[in-house]
Amino acid sequence: MNSFDEPTLGFYSAQAKSYVSHRPDEIDPQIAQFLDLLKPGARILELGCGGGVDAAHMISRGFDVDPTDGVAEMAAIAEQRLNRNVRVMRFDELATVEAYDAVVANASLLHAPTKGLPAIFTSIWAALRHGGWHFATFKTGAASGYDRHGRYYNYLSRAEAKALYRDAGDWASIDFDEWPGVGYFSEPAMWLKMIARKALA
């Protein structure tokens, strides 16, 4: 296990339809607030778009969205919702340079193996244009490992996430927030939100 976890991808492949059916159609309010930071028509890369709920709302607000997911079955569901191509791409396959005004990763990077995060975060930084924004949410409060559904979580602490992002590139700002919430199957979870802005030059 280095840059991706096969059992976790397998879970989402097998459970794609069931997982999407549990997801409300409303956009995550944390993302809605983040989008207010962006200029109209901003080019957004979404990593781990799932069934495409957040992408649909971003598109409805006039943003130029590039939705991606590492699981083909998820991408297919998102394509039906969005009526557009959804690329099948794992986090470690991101190789674009200075192409996006924002990179959104809502409850997706939390499945990336900790050892693979430095390279992934560096790729995200590289994909952003100068002054671009990055939004990500993670689960926190436990040691990295698998949940009862067989999904891997890196469970980063605020300090760990901040150190990893700082090492990934030159950021103008990196801000965090934590709150109690729920995850899949309405299981209690502590969430960590990260918003960073790439340096202007």
What are these regions (language model features)?
Residues 1-39, 41-50, 142:
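Conserved class I S-adenosyl-L-methionine
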Residues 51-93:
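Class I SAM-dependent methyltransferase SAM/SAH-binding core
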Residues 93-103:
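A short acidic, Gly/Pro-enriched loop at the edge of an enzyme's catalytic core
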Residues 118-130:
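A short glycine-rich, Lys/Arg-flanked "PGG" loop and its adjoining helix->strand segment in the class I
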Residues 131-138:
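Conserved beta-strand signature within the Rossmann-like core of class I S-adenosyl-L-methionine
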Residues 145-160, 184:
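Acceptor-substrate binding/catalytic loop of class I
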Residues 170-182:
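Conserved S-adenosyl-L-methionine
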